[in-house]
């Protein structure tokens, strides 16, 4: 938590948000209602966009490496709602140079794993693939330095049948807001000045949540239940289950209308949110999320392409290894590196 004013930096980062995003190839599947949109503040010209492959060197160890810290914390049983105390574990990525930059605040991305994995998986799988990617994105100036927190919805022994994890996925956003986010964002230098609910709402523009598979189910629940605490949502390869298991695929119009009503009634977020949804063309869950996203895009007063886009990775399957390309494309959009704090000059040539 930073205790000094970052007003100028925050304003300039917001001002340059759209100018730093041009790193995706796109092809048009613009809906009829959106054909009049020549340009949008999102930087994406259509609902459906193709992702750009990750350079091979980004998956290798970087010269400047961040660190990963384990955090064990106290929480409650939010599934049964009985107030029973329990413990959970998260892993926090701190970017290279964090210890030396005592006057800089950091945005935070919260990641939720898929079935059969743990909070440790995000930074360990594929020989540290995601950790290497973060190191390179930051070192090469593709994005601003951020803190990444890998979380878990698992209570004790994981369930065998992945849909049975649904109640745990639904409970995790509440656990994050009540217990983990206040701990992380008071311990580390973030934009959160106070860790009560009002303070977390005030800093929501500097916070994102995303997840893969059942983690995507969790991300849709976060949109439904904790919209006032996150600005960016990154569901990867699964639909939302607010109206029942697989409801986003089976009842896309009803799911879209439900989420739109939630957003319209939000007390603090207004239209200040963004859903960066994605999947792979060979992913078994591709249709689940894409069907829902198309239904959402029909509700143009809420889910126009300034607030919702879908990003498709060619030939990608439902495996952890596909995540690097999604994050390579998404993180520079959410957290652009447009402003050099030391020189107090914009660094993007397009500005």
Which stretches of residues belong to each language-model region?
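Accessible peptide chain termini
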Residues: 1-3, 351
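Non-catalytic cap/lid and distal C-terminal segments of serine-dependent acyl enzymes
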Residues: 27-351
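Sec-dependent signal peptide recognition
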Residues: 3-13
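Bacterial signal peptide processing site
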Residues: 21-24
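C-terminal motif of bacterial Sec signal peptides marking the signal peptidase cleavage site
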Residues: 16-19
